[in-house]
Amino acid sequence: MIRAGAAAALVVWLIAGIAPAMAHPHVFITASATFVFAGDKIAAMRVEWLFDDVFSDTVIQDHDANHDGHFDKKEIADIEAHAFTAVKDFHYFTYLWVAGKMIEPIHVRDFSARQANGLVTYSFVVPLPEPVDPRQAKVQAELYDETYFVQVDLDKPHPVRFEGAGHGCQGKVTKDAKRRYYGGVIVPDQITVVCGG
């Protein structure tokens, strides 16, 4: 194991691919999605994960090398390499559709991590293959881990935000029964971007 803490345990589990039947939530994430506009089109989605206190504490202990309560660039790069990159094999717990077609593979950029009040937040950007006008093509997103090793819940009361020219847009959250997972027990939340005009 690269490190003794939970951050490394999560990565090792992701790489090893423990069977879903053996999994249950060990890490808890409160997630939000920010749709980033370029002009009147969605160019990307920024995802934020706020971790539970137990996992946060381990990330801080493992990666805040100078114990100053802040992650510097080197520490963030260390977190990305050892406690984020392997999630690529699990779609970064992020699913995006444009006009009903899933975007595959998911690419991410601009990873960052920060800590506040003992809790760690990851942030990363998922660019769309090309900018999309949500008034012309339906844009939808879901954030979850289908193995249920990590429980991902949308932030309340602000699961969806807009940046740029997203005026008149809102994020409608519904349950997507067609994508039940973990033996059909868990029904993921689906975000649909709805824009007037």
Describe the role of every protein-language-model region.
Residues 5-17:
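Bacterial N-terminal signal peptides
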Residues 25-51, 55-57:
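Early extracytoplasmic/domain-onset interaction patches
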Residues 93, 97-197:
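Mature, soluble, non-transmembrane domains
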